[in-house]
Amino acid sequence: MSDIMSTFSWLYGKPVATGKLKQLPEHFIVKEVLGYEFTGKGEHLMVKIRKTGENTKYVANEFAKFCGVKSKDISWAGLKDRHAVTEQWLSVHLPKSDHLNFVLFEVAHPGVEILEMTRHHKKLRPGDLLGNSFQLIATEVTDMDDVLARLEKVKVTGVPNYFGAQRFGHEGNNVTEARRWGRENVRTRDNTKRSFYLSAARSWIFNHIISQRITEGYFSLPVDGDILLDQNDRTVNENVTSEDCIQKIKKGELSISAALAGDNQLPTTEKALMFEQPQLDAEPDLMALIRGNRMRHERRSIELHPENLHWSVEGDQLTLNFSLTSGSFATVIVRELLQEIEVERTYD
């Protein structure tokens, strides 16, 4: 388990079990779920790939070279992990492709398979991703009984909707750099770095808000001044501590939200504000970066409920299957089940 995540509270207490995740790429399978169908015609070639041990940007750049286009002419709905087997779509602005033999691309890149091709009238964008389905295999698991007991709780209550360790970079470097940028008022034209550091800053503060609620025993219990979200992420103006709202939260019809910090005033009041404002105040450098880039405040649910969650056990091996909506992290589910033993990897 990444040390950076040990900063945040566990909903069910720190796990006693240990295990290995991603011992092989085949132990972490991700399949992308888009929110719409392609038209079958248009200037954009849509390519469904299965990649093993490769990251999305590398494959996209290699595919752009093969097609004879610039990197900016290729796009995707979501970035996928390198240490996994992942299926996803790429789009290439390529009005004509009859001259290309795509088998040659697969031969040159044995870690990539082309599964399907079609066409569409516009390119893929990050907001196009509806979610992902996962199959995760944890190996060398100890204390399997405790893991299974936790899984039963997860199925009912869910897990904290934390941003995962990958959001914060290797050893939390994105947060460290975000603080430096805020402190030194760094200005740059590198939009990629700016995006990484802003995301890390807001995610770090958000995670701390959830962690504080767990510590004080208010993870799934609304308090005065809370902002609730419906199933379409729209804010709900009701008496949030009423029995009706509490029952809707238990049924998953409403969810408690926490702040993705911005340069405008927090909308929470009373006790809910006391969970949020101190976390913003504790990170003046991160807030300087957020305000300096005129980020607007947003809300995000504090609960994550994996859909279609089921599992199987074979000896000391646990197989998990579930689906998540876009923007959620599979690793925060595993985090509530076991302490991850780091797997040594070699890099080409």
From Swiss-Prot:
UniProt-listed PROSITE patterns: TRUD, UPF0024
All residue ranges annotated as the TRUD domain in the record: 158-304
Annotated catalytic residues: D81 (nucleophile)
Keyword annotations: Isomerase, tRNA processing
Gene Ontology cellular-component terms listed: cytosol
Coiled coil: none
GO biological process, one term: tRNA pseudouridine synthesis
A molecular function GO annotation: tRNA pseudouridine(13) synthase activity
EC code: 5.4.99.27
tRNA processing as UniProt keyword: yes
Superkingdom as given in the UniProt entry: Bacteria
Disulfide bonds: none
InterPro entries in UniProt: PsdUridine_synth_cat_dom_sf, PsdUridine_synth_TruD, PsdUridine_synth_TruD_CS, PsdUridine_synth_TruD_insert, TruD_catalytic, TruD_insert_sf, TruD_pseudoU_synthase
Chain's role: Responsible for synthesis of pseudouridine from uracil-13 in transfer RNAs.
Family: Belongs to the pseudouridine synthase TruD family.
HAMAP family linked: TruD
NCBIfam families per the UniProt record, alphabetical: PRK00984.1-4, tRNA_TruD_broad
Protein name (record): tRNA pseudouridine synthase D
Organism of derivation: Aliivibrio salmonicida (strain LFI1238) (Vibrio salmonicida (strain LFI1238))
Lineage per the UniProt record: Bacteria, Pseudomonadati, Pseudomonadota, Gammaproteobacteria, Vibrionales
